[in-house]
């Protein structure tokens, strides 16, 4: 399972949970609570860069307004200049406003939203791991536990029951 092997948090998450299970902490609710706390902490920490980008996106229009105000001040300082000079100052003020709004809503905001979507998708992946392990702790058979995990897969990626069954049947007996 290459995705799990490349994901250090997923490996630690699975190993820590299995370690708790081997230490006779077999109450599924306690294990689920511990896993939930670990997932919340990880999700909160992983989302910090997206929150920082969104904060920057929220502030950029204000910088555009500051540029507009400075442009107006500069224009007022040269009020006796010919219209062509005043037009340049006013144009500069408008460009500053436009850039602040354009960069915020055209680049930084969408990038922050994309980052958050990636973190949310990762969180779904970890949540599926949690669902499968907790279902197993409740005494369900492996196929039932995996089916419970399948229910948490986002719809656009969720395999059908038949696809999952085919994948499970393809696992060699010595592994399963």
Tell me the role of every PLM-derived stretch.
Residues 1-49, 121-176:
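Large intracellular
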Residues 38-118:
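Helix-termination/interfacial motifs at the ends of transmembrane alpha-helices
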């Amino acid at each position: 399972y290459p995705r799990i092997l490349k994901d250090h948090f997923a490996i630690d998450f699975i190993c820590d949970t299995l370690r708790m299970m081997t230490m006779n902490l077999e109450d599924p609710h306690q294990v689920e609570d511990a896993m939930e706390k670990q997932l919340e902490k990880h999700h909160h920490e992983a989302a910090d860069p997206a929150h920082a980008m969104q904060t920057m996106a929220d502030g950029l229009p204000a910088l555009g307004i500051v540029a507009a105000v400075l442009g107006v001040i500069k224009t007022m300082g040269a009020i006796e200049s010919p219209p062509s000079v005043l037009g340049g100052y006013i144009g500069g003020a408008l460009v500053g406003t436009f850039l602040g709004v354009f960069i915020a809503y055209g680049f930084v905001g969408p990038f922050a939203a994309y980052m958050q979507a990636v973190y949310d998708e990762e969180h779904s992946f970890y949540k599926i791991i949690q669902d499968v392990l907790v279902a197993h702790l409740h005494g369900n058979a492996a196929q039932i536990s995996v089916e419970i995990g399948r229910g948490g897969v986002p719809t656009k990626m969720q395999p059908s029951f038949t696809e999952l069954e085919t994948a499970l049947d393809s696992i060699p007996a010595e592994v399963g």
